[in-house]
Amino acid sequence: MNIKTTVCSILAVLFLISCDNQTSSLGGSLTPQGDVITVTSDSCFATSRTIKSSDSLIVMTTQCNLGRFTEQASGATIQTGYLTQLGCMENFSIADSVYGIGNHVFPQWFIDTVGTQKPYYANLKLYYSTFFGDSTNSIKIEVFPLERMIDAGKRYYPDVDPSYFCNTSAKPLVSVTVSGWNMQEYDSIRIDDDYYHSISISLPDSIAKMILEAYSNPDTRHYFNDSKSFMENLIKGFYIRCSQGDGTIFYIERTVLEVNFKCIDFDDDNKPLMQSLMAEFLGNSEVLQMNSIKWTGLEEELADNSCTWIRSPFGVMTEITLPVDDMRDDEYVLNSAMLRLSSANTPSSKFKPSIPTTLLLIRKDLLQDFFGKNSIQDNVESYIATYSSKYGSYTYNNIAAMIEKMYNDRADWLEENGKTLQNGGLAAYEQERPDWNKVVLVPVAANLDSRSSAISYSLDINMHQLKLIGGSTPIKIKTIRSKF
């Protein structure tokens, strides 16, 4: 056999993954005299279970979910709302030529009207690109003014209690019934290329009056210098929730407070003109927005040992215990470990959450830090896989580096603590680090740069449901190991 043939043969063996044990002794011209490489392909088996999703995960996204949905088969229900601050542009201003309506000097025209039109009013606009569920289903939305400031220096999680920031037992500031197919807008508007779905909520006129009075007063004009001053002195924000209805979740991308008012301006000839102006105060990435998500009825999926489940956002997730000692020992080097996770069929329904496109596989004890630091997978302690509709699975082609890291972390700890696996070291290590060999699966969404390359991953908080083969059925991991 010539050198070229030998090289090809070795490469073929190194990348071979099969279900049966195979051992080959390779030598010859590629190794020193007397050295033999033994390559073994094998299968090991991991165990898995369904666990409750961690509430202590940072949501690095501007999307806020609003609505309620009950899954027909399991009865699991998600109810979502959100808290939002409203930003004010630095050095916000209204044209100095604004004088008021009729003979009234600004702001005395607050008591006046222009024909049948209001001189001022305020709307809260909730903009969404899409929603989950029934487009004709109606839900009732309630709005509460925040009574406490959201602390910008504190981390908040999806289990945040809105009652800390406002009196959720009191009568709401306003309530409105809406559906995904916005009946408030004409069909001719919806077909426009620039159309963006929105929910418009009319707020009490007193909010517009308060803002305009504060702006017109020289002593309070500084309230509009920046967002912090605006929130501390005028509007701390709103809590928006679904109080009635079931079957729709809106994916809110932007919340805007619109203050509309009539005024008199003057043209170049100094003639008075009636004007309609609008000031906007935005809820966006520059101010805090927090999802408040609550699940009920997850007990059935948590107890189901015939499979494992992923239900997002923040419902349940799959935990896998990796057989580190079956895959790695001091005698062999682990060259490759392929993990394939196959989906299982679920009952069909008219409105069924989609299968997540991308799953993060990460060491369980690193999950919180990953999202808190706005990270990307390192292919050592975290990996990314996308769903293959052709094969109905997610494939992590090589997690050998993760197995090596788990194995070496334990070895280092045993050495530092003067223990061995044989003298109680294993039990001591597992007591101190019970999740040392555990990973979890979490739906994620990529944050892209200008070249459409992923620069980080954030939690995917859209509605997703995934049933995986596992639980009482072991998960096969195909390995290739070698030794001299």
Regions found by a protein language model. Give the residues of each.
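Secreted, disulfide-rich extracellular signaling modules
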Residues: N2-S9, V13, C19-F484
